[in-house]
Amino acid sequence: MHNTTKRVTVPALEEILYEPIKVLDHGFIRVIDYMGDDSAIVQAARVSYGKGTKQLNQDKGLINYLLRHYHTTPFEMCDIKFHIKLPIFIARQWIRHRTASVNEYSARYSILGNEFYLPEPANIASQSAVNKQCREGDSLPKEGAEKVLAILEEDAKQCYGHYKELMNADEDGNIIDENNTGIARELARMNLTLNYYTEWYWKINLHNLLHFLRLRADPHAQYEIRVYAEKMLEIVKAWVPFTYEAFEEYRLQGANISRKGLDVIKRMIKGEKVTHESSGMTKREWEELMKIFG
């Protein structure tokens, strides 16, 4: 039977629906479903004052205005659902964004697959001396990176072997030793390392997705979550191109400047030589402001 729909569809998104987009070594993102497009945002905004459909350039201008002035409700009219496979340690960071509906693969009911994440040597670096939550920019020497990878792989394989031994079952659920009862899956899973992969369905509205992407596609975000965010940016661009363009203009490539920062800029425009000491800003604020202006 031929399927028909009266709802808005986006051809560029229909093309990738259900298709896995590879991320990291064993991860992926799949678009499972979506609701709305750029026109749904415009429709929601215009109902506030009863105006009809406008020209595309006016729609684009309205979306720019809404995003620029932090109007949020119209963007909440669009939803998207993803199927995502990701390392457990990234899932725990990801779930800090509490504005999505999530259902995760349960290692209480099922046996977790034998797939774990190993970083590329170029992404193995020491702890930053400046930022307490991230790595340095320079990679470890080849020998150091190889040692790290060997330890990570050995630990993951050993723990998965013990995981199966504790359950007395292989990854397909087959009994290993008929004379051993094993322990419950909900207990055996505690021994697995955090680089093992989990999966979940993640449904979120566009407003909250953009907030997630603003933080996680940022160069300061951890590499392993940033690569997922970068793939999602490509999906958003295909789904809502006007919104993506406005988001890139006002959020990704734009900047928020404090009152003191604006005062510094005004003084500089007038020809005054402003220094950190005379700015009234903290060292970090001053450095961030100077970075904005190159």
UniProtKB/Swiss-Prot annotation:
Keyword presence, Flavoprotein: yes
The cofactor named in the record is:
FAD
Q: Which residues form the active site?
A: R216
Superkingdom of the organism of origin? Bacteria
Instruction: Quote the catalytic activity from the record.
Output: dUMP + (6R)-5,10-methylene-5,6,7,8-tetrahydrofolate + NADPH + H(+) = dTMP + (6S)-5,6,7,8-tetrahydrofolate + NADP(+)
Residue positions annotated to bind dUMP are: Q93, W94, I95, R96, E104, Y105, S106, A107, R108, R189, R216
EC top class named in words: transferase
Q: Which residues bind FAD?
A: T73, R96, H97, R98, E104, N205, L206, H207, H211
Q: Where is this motif: ThyX motif?
A: 96-106
Q: Which GO terms describe its biological process?
A: dTMP biosynthetic process; dTTP biosynthetic process; methylation
- Transferase among keywords: yes
Q: What keywords are annotated for this sequence in UniProt?
A: FAD, Flavoprotein, Methyltransferase, NADP, Nucleotide biosynthesis, Transferase
Outline the extent of the ThyX domain.
27-250
Q: Which Pfam families match?
A: Thy1 (PF02511)
Which molecular function GO terms apply here?
flavin adenine dinucleotide binding; NADPH binding; thymidylate synthase (FAD) activity; thymidylate synthase activity
Disulfide feature? none
By its UniProt entry, which InterPro entries does this protein fall under?
Answer: Thymidylate_synthase_ThyX, Thymidylate_synthase_ThyX_sf
Entry's EC annotation: 2.1.1.148
* Pathway(s) the chain acts in: Pyrimidine metabolism; dTTP biosynthesis
The record's remark on the cofactor is: Binds 4 FAD per tetramer. Each FAD binding site is formed by three monomers.
PANTHER family named among the record's database cross-references: FLAVIN-DEPENDENT THYMIDYLATE SYNTHASE
Q: Which family does it belong to?
A: Belongs to the thymidylate synthase ThyX family.
Q: What does this protein do?
A: Catalyzes the reductive methylation of 2'-deoxyuridine-5'-monophosphate (dUMP) to 2'-deoxythymidine-5'-monophosphate (dTMP) while utilizing 5,10-methylenetetrahydrofolate (mTHF) as the methyl donor, and NADPH and FADH(2) as the reductant.
Protein name in the entry? Flavin-dependent thymidylate synthase
Q: Which organism is it from?
A: Rickettsia felis (strain ATCC VR-1525 / URRWXCal2)
Lineage of producing organism: Bacteria, Pseudomonadati, Pseudomonadota, Alphaproteobacteria, Rickettsiales
What gene name does this entry carry? thyX
